[in-house]
Amino acid sequence: MFLTGVAYGWVADDVEDLVGDNDAVRDVIAQYGGVSLTDSYLARSILTLALIGTGYAIQSVLRLRGEETALRAEPVLATPVPRHRWVASHLAVALGGSVIVLAAGGLGTGLTYGIIGHDLGQVPRLLGAALVYVPALWLLVGFATALFGLVPRGVSAAAWAALAFCLVIGVLGEVLDVPAQVGDLSPFQHTPLLPADDLAIAPPVVLSAIAAALIVVGLLGFRRRDLGGATTT
């Protein structure tokens, strides 16, 4: 992820020249807001990094189902290890690892862009732009966790479908003229598009609360059901 960020940061300084007079490309990039084409490009790049990082987080959550279907979870849970602790150990990897992944992408982008532009103030600016997506990413982690606890047989398909939906909305939503009501279903649409937009505190706080609620739902659901996917009565 750091190297992907480096690539984005490398291009950022030349994006005005690369786009040139291509109005179509300018319009697509400008849809991400900002007072300059460079900021719009950086906002789009950071969003892409966040979506890539979400893939890592979802895969980490889906390891829970993989352990269960491979019959490796049952021997562990037959010991005094509580179910919620077993799930929490996997969630710690997904939640904590996703922060590291996003930070690496933002750091790579900011460091490269800052060095090329002789402005290392871009490092904290773009690092913060990446980390502001953590709540949206965690919401999808919560969604996958809730599915694992309630309807485990469909968790993989539904979790990846949710990410694919967010990807289409985030990258192509404006181009495809997706209705706002549909686009708003993506948590990433409620995250400030830094550095093009101003920071708003309320959306990340609300997204974090929803993510926490979904994780609790998943933990409670897993406690009530049998291993293998059946639900206890």
Language model features with spans:
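Extracellular/periplasmic helix-exit of transmembrane alpha-helices
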Residues: 4-23, 54, 104-115
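Terminal transmembrane helical anchor/hairpin motif
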Residues: 7-33, 158-233
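Secretory targeting signals
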Residues: 92-145, 205-208
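Membrane-interface alpha-helices at helix entry/exit sites of multi-pass transporters
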Residues: 82-95
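A structural motif at transmembrane helix-loop-helix junctions in multipass membrane proteins
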Residues: 134-168
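Transmembrane helix boundary and interhelical loop/hinge segments in multi-pass membrane proteins
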Residues: 58-77
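Long, hydrophobic alpha-helical segments
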Residues: 40-64
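Hydrophobic/aromatic residues in alpha-helical transmembrane segments
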Residues: 11, 54-57, 104, 108, ...
